[in-house]
Each structure stands twice: as structure tokens, then as C-alpha cells.
């Protein structure tokens, strides 16, 4: 079982990244929050969990243990597989998922692609008592970071991530600039998610 990877980030795609470790490239599927913390050509460490099927072995990557545990926990719900668990973490932070489930907010959970009313209610029933403590398990680095002005480093890093995801700088920069101007308190991962949301509506 591969539980973590440390190596050079070779490429970043729309939903995955390739990390080379000792000459071997591993494709890791991940949510935008995780991909947004990676930079091509730089060293990175990601926590992983492997999902084994009859014809495939797939690695999923995370920036912190709380996110990885939530990914595994979500799959304990009948009918909720790894793709849906990853979709949940692409829409919400681990903290948000725990809060929506604990609060019985089925309407919020239905914002996850592929989750209807019945699945949302099942998630609440099955996991309401199991998400206690998840908010406390998220490291400070993963919490929203407040700032008074737009951090230039955040803009540069998010722009690089967007270009790595296949968007041209000409298209991505105006969208990202607007996102950060309207919400300068956003962290890198939050800004990436917001920019991807806007860029997605333009396709």
C-alpha cells in the first residue's frame, strides 16, 4: 500500500498530477485544493490512498491526513465510490463536508456533482456521528488564510497552476485577477477553486 509520495512534480493536469519518485512516475488523482499546492519542477510530498479494482490500481492524493481520512470515510456510504468522494472534495473543503453532514444540510451536499437528495440524506444518516472531530484535525495551513491585500505570490502561484492545468495565461490572468480583487482574503487553494469555477463556465 502506497501511503505517501515524495518527488518531483512532472506535470499537473485537470484532475491529476504526475510525481516522479526514483525514476518512476506516479499519476495521482486529486482535488483542485491539492493540485493548487503543487508546482511543476519542484519537490513535493503528498499523502495517498490506493483504490484497487479488478482491472486498475488508482492513487488519490491529499495535502493533509484529515482530507485523506474524509475521502476514505465518504466511501463507507453505500453507492458512494472514489470518484464521488473526490468530487465532494473538489467542491467543499474537508471542514465544510464535515459541517454540512453534522448539520444535516442535505441541500448543500446536493451541490456535489452526482449527489442527489437520496444520496445526500444517506450521507447524513451514515456519517453524522462519524465526522465529529474532523474540523479539529485540519492543520492551520489548510484553513482559510486572511489577508488585507492581494498577495502577489498567491496570484503568481495560482496562475502557474492554471497554466499547468491547460489554460492560457491570456485567458486565466484576467479571471484570476478579478477573483483576487473581489476576495483578497482567499488562500491559494481557494483562489484556484474559484478561478476554475469561473473558467469552467466559459467553456
UniProtKB/Swiss-Prot annotation:
<dbReference type="GO" id="GO:0048476">
    <property type="term" value="C:Holliday junction resolvase complex"/>
</dbReference>
<dbReference type="Pfam" id="PF07499">
    <property type="entry name" value="RuvA_C"/>
</dbReference>
<dbReference type="Pfam" id="PF01330">
    <property type="entry name" value="RuvA_N"/>
</dbReference>
<comment type="function">
    <text>The RuvA-RuvB-RuvC complex processes Holliday junction (HJ) DNA during genetic recombination and DNA repair, while the RuvA-RuvB complex plays an important role in the rescue of blocked DNA replication forks via replication fork reversal (RFR). RuvA specifically binds to HJ cruciform DNA, conferring on it an open structure. The RuvB hexamer acts as an ATP-dependent pump, pulling dsDNA into and through the RuvAB complex. HJ branch migration allows RuvC to scan DNA until it finds its consensus sequence, where it cleaves and resolves the cruciform DNA.</text>
</comment>
<comment type="similarity">
    <text>Belongs to the RuvA family.</text>
</comment>
<keyword id="KW-0963">Cytoplasm</keyword>
<dbReference type="InterPro" id="IPR000085">
    <property type="entry name" value="RuvA"/>
</dbReference>
<dbReference type="GO" id="GO:0006310">
    <property type="term" value="P:DNA recombination"/>
</dbReference>
<feature type="region of interest" description="Flexible linker">
    <location>
        <begin position="143"/>
        <end position="150"/>
    </location>
</feature>
<dbReference type="GO" id="GO:0006281">
    <property type="term" value="P:DNA repair"/>
</dbReference>
<keyword id="KW-0238">DNA-binding</keyword>
<keyword id="KW-0233">DNA recombination</keyword>
<feature type="region of interest" description="Domain II">
    <location>
        <begin position="64"/>
        <end position="142"/>
    </location>
</feature>
<dbReference type="GO" id="GO:0005737">
    <property type="term" value="C:cytoplasm"/>
</dbReference>
<keyword id="KW-0227">DNA damage</keyword>
<dbReference type="InterPro" id="IPR036267">
    <property type="entry name" value="RuvA_C_sf"/>
</dbReference>
<dbReference type="InterPro" id="IPR011114">
    <property type="entry name" value="RuvA_C"/>
</dbReference>
<protein>
    <recommendedName>
        <fullName>Holliday junction branch migration complex subunit RuvA</fullName>
    </recommendedName>
</protein>
<dbReference type="GO" id="GO:0009379">
    <property type="term" value="C:Holliday junction helicase complex"/>
</dbReference>
<dbReference type="Pfam" id="PF14520">
    <property type="entry name" value="HHH_5"/>
</dbReference>
<keyword id="KW-0234">DNA repair</keyword>
<dbReference type="InterPro" id="IPR010994">
    <property type="entry name" value="RuvA_2-like"/>
</dbReference>
<dbReference type="GO" id="GO:0005524">
    <property type="term" value="F:ATP binding"/>
</dbReference>
<dbReference type="GO" id="GO:0000400">
    <property type="term" value="F:four-way junction DNA binding"/>
</dbReference>
<dbReference type="InterPro" id="IPR013849">
    <property type="entry name" value="DNA_helicase_Holl-junc_RuvA_I"/>
</dbReference>
<dbReference type="GO" id="GO:0009378">
    <property type="term" value="F:four-way junction helicase activity"/>
</dbReference>
<dbReference type="InterPro" id="IPR012340">
    <property type="entry name" value="NA-bd_OB-fold"/>
</dbReference>
<feature type="region of interest" description="Domain I">
    <location>
        <begin position="1"/>
        <end position="63"/>
    </location>
</feature>
<feature type="region of interest" description="Domain III">
    <location>
        <begin position="150"/>
        <end position="203"/>
    </location>
</feature>
<comment type="subunit">
    <text>Homotetramer. Forms an RuvA(8)-RuvB(12)-Holliday junction (HJ) complex. HJ DNA is sandwiched between 2 RuvA tetramers; dsDNA enters through RuvA and exits via RuvB. An RuvB hexamer assembles on each DNA strand where it exits the tetramer. Each RuvB hexamer is contacted by two RuvA subunits (via domain III) on 2 adjacent RuvB subunits; this complex drives branch migration. In the full resolvosome a probable DNA-RuvA(4)-RuvB(12)-RuvC(2) complex forms which resolves the HJ.</text>
</comment>
Amino acid at each position: 500500500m502506497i501511503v505517501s509520495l515524495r518527488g518531483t512534480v512532472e506535470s499537473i493536469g485537470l484532475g491529476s498530477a504526475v510525481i516522479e519518485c526514483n525514476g518512476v512516475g506516479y499519476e495521482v488523482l486529486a482535488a483542485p485544493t491539492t493540485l493548487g499546492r503543487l508546482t511543476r519542477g519542484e519537490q513535493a510530498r503528498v499523502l495517498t490512498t490506493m483504490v484497487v479494482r479488478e482491472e486498475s490500481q488508482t492513487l488519490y492524493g491529499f495535502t493533509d491526513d484529515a482530507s485523506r481520512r474524509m475521502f476514505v470515510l465518504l466511501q463507507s456510504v453505500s453507492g458512494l465510490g472514489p470518484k464521488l468522494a473526490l468530487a465532494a472534495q473538489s467542491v467543499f473543503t474537508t471542514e465544510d463536508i464535515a459541517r454540512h453532514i453534522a448539520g444535516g444540510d442535505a441541500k448543500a451536499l446536493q451541490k456535489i456533482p452526482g449527489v442527489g437528495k437520496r444520496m445526500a440524506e444517506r450521507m447524513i444518516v451514515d456519517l453524522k456521528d462519524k465526522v465529529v472531530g474532523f474540523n479539529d484535525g485540519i492543520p492551520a495551513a489548510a484553513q482559510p488564510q486572511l489577508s488585507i491585500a492581494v498577495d502577489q505570490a498567491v496570484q503568481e502561484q495560482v496562475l502557474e497552476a492554471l497554466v499547468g492545468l491547460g489554460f492560457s495565461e491570456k485567458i486565466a490572468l484576467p479571471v484570476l485577477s478579478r477573483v483576487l480583487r473581489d476576495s483578497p482574503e482567499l488562500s491559494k487553494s481557494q483562489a484556484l477553486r474559484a478561478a476554475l469555477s469561473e473558467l469552467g463556465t466559459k467553456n
